[in-house]
């Protein structure tokens, strides 16, 4: 870096070198401002999509599930089958559950 400044001082003189350095700082400042504006715009965009799409979508999905499939899953008979008769260890179950339908035993 000092090599570059020394070379500029030799070729252009101190005034032009100072102008170049000042212009470089102004360019860095403007780049920072542009980056800040971009980040703010991206943040506002993300906040908009989260507020108006993601949250209502999740709430709507939960509402639909609660009032459709959720009601079906709250059936006490189904719950008793799941809790009491469903095989406990999946595919490795050696004694499958026995289900009764009208007094007939089904396995």
UniProtKB/Swiss-Prot annotation:
Similarity-based family: Belongs to the gammacoronaviruses E protein family.
GO biological process: disruption of cellular anatomical structure in another organism; viral budding from Golgi membrane
Organism domain of life: Viruses
Protein name per UniProt: Envelope small membrane protein
A matching Pfam family: IBV_3C
Record field: transmembrane: 12-32
Organism listed in the record: Avian infectious bronchitis virus (strain UK/183/66)
The encoding gene: E
Main subcellular location of this protein, as a coarse class: host cell
Subunit composition and interactions: Homooligomer. Interacts with the M membrane protein in the budding compartment of the host cell, which is located between endoplasmic reticulum and the Golgi complex. The cytoplasmic tails of both proteins are important for this function. Interacts with Nucleoprotein.
Keyword Membrane: yes
Family annotation (InterPro entries): E_protein_CoV, IBV_3C
Function: Plays a central role in virus morphogenesis and assembly. Acts as a viroporin and self-assembles in host membranes forming pentameric protein-lipid pores that allow ion transport. Also plays a role in the induction of apoptosis.
GO CC entries: host cell Golgi membrane; membrane
Positions on the Intravirion side per record topology: 33-107
Topology class, membrane: Single-pass type III membrane protein
């Amino acid at each position: 870096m000092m090599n570059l400044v020394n070379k500029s001082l030799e070729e252009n003189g101190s005034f032009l070198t100072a102008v170049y350095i000042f212009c470089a700082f102004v360019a860095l400042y403007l780049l920072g401002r542009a980056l800040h504006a971009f980040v703010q715009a991206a943040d506002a965009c993300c906040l908009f999509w989260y507020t108006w799409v993601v949250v209502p979508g999740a709430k709507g999905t939960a509402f639909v599930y609660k009032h459709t499939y959720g009601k079906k899953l709250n059936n006490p008979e189904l719950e008793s089958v799941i809790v009491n008769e469903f095989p406990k260890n999946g595919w490795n179950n050696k004694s499958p559950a026995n289900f009764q339908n009208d007094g007939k035993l089904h396995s």
